[in-house]
């Protein structure tokens, strides 16, 4: 991407970096008064402020980004039908919160809007992307420290400020009784997705810096393992391992893997980790170690015999199969992106959700190049699609904001007056470069 080296451009980049750093850090903040999350204040506040400054007129999206935003808006529209014309609810399940439902759907749009206004005003998207990645990597590394500390101490009172506003037992509290420690996150699945995203970001940032690579990847691997999240173990970690193995340079690749393995091994010898009671739960996931249906085991009962999703799917079809129960949803755990779409927007929502994920993949496929950003984007899309089988990855609290910050900068937001991603080199045909899984693509160090 070509930037005019002017004071205005530099100023826009500095303010843009400050904005995305603030938003990224807010994801790891506590609940505030009235059950409001820190990230809600940061994202909506930034969107309102930038719109008030008139930057809304500078918004520019890629072709794929325009399709993604249109599909997401269509989901919002279909889900709103259930608000304007509430369907009969013959089930025994109560509807959810109207504000909570709209927040889940509108927050991703607000994140994309903020990014588009920042880039449209002259901020360098490469600098913004790097800032988001740095904060995400080291914040999740810090979350690993919190998770380790939780093993040997009773930190429930403090962590409740981050996990669940108000009284009651959180999902994380119940998970910890099984030895699954997710730090500040309310669900191991949320932690697993963000550890996966942070791992991909660490590879992108430190692929040529072995010390930082080793420390960050080791910390993130331990944190993801302590959460015993299938999203991390079965989706994020394999994708990250594949990218590490494809780093060019045999010696550098072997050093990176060896140092990371040694670091993980040494850290697991800490006295506190030796007392980790989730080891048995983790070992059950090894092939042949678990009893009963392996599909049920690997998906935590979401799929396989006696699927936990059957009740939710049945309730959605009983209420309104085509348009769903509306944006309020039902007070049931969805545990799946497509199931959430079915509940709030019916079969139409499922089709739109699938099309949105496909649009992200096609957007990456058409814009892939020999740049490391292409590898990050491809891994991120695969992680989001895989994670969607275990939670609503593009709308879930906290992790959705990080996901859309990265997806927005990589695939959705365009250069001013352009319809392509900023990291796609002009003049290079999309079919002249093989898919971004070839070894030489991962290590391409050219910067915009």
Can you describe what each PLM-predicted range is?
Residues 18-26, 364-391, 402, 409-411:
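Loop-to-helix entry and N-terminal half of a specific, functionally important transmembrane alpha helix
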Residues 209-210, 237, 241-244, 250, ...:
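Hydrophobic transmembrane alpha-helices and their immediate junctions
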Residues 379-387, 393-443, 448:
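Transmembrane alpha-helices of multi-pass inner-membrane enzymes
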Residues 130-161, 173-177, 182-228, 233-245:
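Alpha-helical transmembrane segments of multi-pass inner-membrane proteins
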Residues 152-154, 247-293, 315:
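A membrane-periplasm/extracellular boundary helix in multi-pass inner-membrane enzymes
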Residues 281-283, 289-348, 364-369:
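Long extracytoplasmic/lumenal interhelical loops at the membrane interface
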Residues 15-31, 47-116, 382-388:
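N-terminal hydrophobic segments of proteins, predominantly signal-anchor/transmembrane helices
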